[in-house]
């Protein structure tokens, strides 16, 4: 993926209108009251909330370090396991979506195929962002035994990379929910899984 793909994801204001017909039928503010919210839809939303929460924790953690509220050793002990959890689970989640759920959902509702292609392209862009994030984080962690100036420079570089990743992720998660949750509400998760057989 290129910087252009990065930019498209970051600049997108939401799904194209022609893919929002189910989202208009099932507005976000009504999801929790729908009978089909349990099961797959609820799991999807909880998983996405977890990614938002972990992303926020990483952003706040690097902010705490940069503001001097955490020492370098304390930050490293706190940061590394959370970053690994975030990156690993996000990548695994995207793989399950790309190879299991998206094909089943596109088969169940072919009019949304282009939406799943957009989400798949997002996953590739986000995966590259994950790799850049991990590289910047590792570079930062390596500087924790070096001069304070090098630590600050590396922390700033990581914070910039993290900000880009979190911005892409927020846009993608919202668009994915706007495409998938209304489909699940409309059809029910059992019908969607059964369509994959």
Where do the model's predicted regions map?
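Small-residue-biased structural context
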Residues: 1-197
